[in-house]
Design a protein with these regions (language model features):
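All-alpha prenyltransferase/terpene-synthase fold signal
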Residues: 1-384
Length: 384
């Protein structure tokens, strides 16, 4: 079934462009996000909107919109909650004079006019924007933690404005995302995305250690890779999987469809991060748009090194001291290149990509489904 789906997606008459399928919805994404981020404090306004100036890949909202369109053709859940219109999701729940008290610049959250296309609902478009807000907030915080100096080819926010401003801007984005999320008026969707925010923090704490016990001279054990995959889910796949599930819920899809949407997002997210970890070893900083080898410089052992470690005990010493001594980073890279760690990482990413495609097999054939399949295929072809 998976091979048939891939064949159909890759042998269509015209190349599949996932972005084209939801181009109308994506067109207003950045503008709507900037409107959600309005602040009466000029400095905060500038920092909060800083990462919206450079055109990012917008992978997560693209996936949400494709999933919204693909699941619109799936069976509906009985007695599912009412899906709210643009007017409803833009209107406050609390009195406006309370929400805007001493904050006259609190945005009205107004969106672009509703499209005549009804297969992507206003609430699902807003979910795509919320997903990007949460992701951007995590970038602001991660860049502070990682002491990053660049992002998307420009100075990172922490480098441009300082750590304090970057952290506060990230917090502000999460606050705005939470308000927009509440106005979707769907308790399960709120629960899912609130859990994502907690997961991002949990994953970051797990990343402070390369192994569960964080020993100074660790030995390879079978629990090392599950620890890495759990951290990877929390930091990367949680947002993609839970936003896919939320998109299906907002579209009133039945339980099977909702579960399959989640499975697609989870497997795609894991594949995405595995490829990201692999590129850190195979591409230059110029190709990536960020420093190559950054993971090792930060003391992080990712999939290629973990696979190599299983047959190269010397890596355990380097992992234990987090590559801090002179020559450690270069030696670790050499040992990874001498192993099949990169090839095993690629194979695992392919497996997760195929599992993502398999999760879509019960979805009716559609352009959006083909777009989701193409996203899974393209994840393996990423060069940055």
């Amino acid at each position: 079934m998976v091979s048939n789906a891939v064949t159909r997606a890759t042998k269509s008459e015209l190349p599949i462009d996932p972005l084209r399928i939801v181009a109308k919805e994506m067109k207003h994404l950045t503008g709507n996000i900037r409107q959600l981020l309005g602040s009466g404090h000029p400095s905060l306004d500038r920092v909060a909107k800083y990462y919206t100036q450079a055109e990012g890949k917008h992978v997560r909202p693209l996936i949400v919109l494709l999933m919204s369109r693909a699941t619109s053709l799936c069976p509906k859940a009985p007695d599912s909650p009412h899906t709210h219109s643009t007017a409803t999701i833009d209107s406050a729940i609390s009195p406006l004079d309370v929400l805007a008290d001493v904050n006259p610049s609190s945005p009205d959250f107004s969106s672009q006019p509703e499209s005549s296309e009804h297969d992507v609902l206003p609430s699902q478009r807003r979910l795509a924007e919320i997903t990007e807000l949460i992701h951007t907030a995590s970038l602001l915080h991660d860049d502070v933690i990682d002491h990053s100096v660049s992002r998307r080819g420009s100075p990172s926010a922490n480098h441009e404005f300082g750590n304090k401003m970057a952290v506060l801007a990230g917090d502000f984005l999460l606050g705005r995302a939470s308000v927009a999320l509440a106005r979707l008026r769907n308790a399960e969707v709120v629960e899912l995305l609130a859990t994502v925010i907690a997961n991002l923090v949990e994953g970051e704490f797990m990343q402070l250690k390369n192994t569960a016990r964080d020993e100074r001279n660790p030995k390879w054990s079978e629990d090392i890779f599950p620890y890495y995959l759990q951290k990877t889910y929390l930091k990367t796949a949680s947002l993609i999987s839970k936003s896919c599930r939320a998109a299906a819920l907002l579209g009133r899809a039945d339980a099977t469809t909702v579960d399959n949407a989640y499975a697609y997002g989870k497997n795609l997210g894991l594949a995405f991060q595995l490829v990201d970890d692999m590129l850190d070893y195979t591409k230059s900083g110029k190709d990536l748009g960020k420093p190559a080898g950054a993971d090792l410089q930060l003391g992080l052992a990712t999939a290629p090194l973990l696979f190599a470690w299983k047959t190269t005990p010397e890596l355990g010493i380097l992992v234990g001291r987090k590559f801090e001594q002179e020559g450690d980073v270069q030696r670790a890279r050499e040992l990874v290149y001498q192993s099949d760690g990169i090839e095993q990482t690629r194979a695992l990413a392919e497996d997760y990509s195929h599992q993502a495609i398999a999760a879509l097999q019960t979805f009716p054939d559609s352009e959006a489904k083909d777009g989701l399949i193409e996203m899974a295929i393209n994840t393996l072809k990423r060069q940055k």
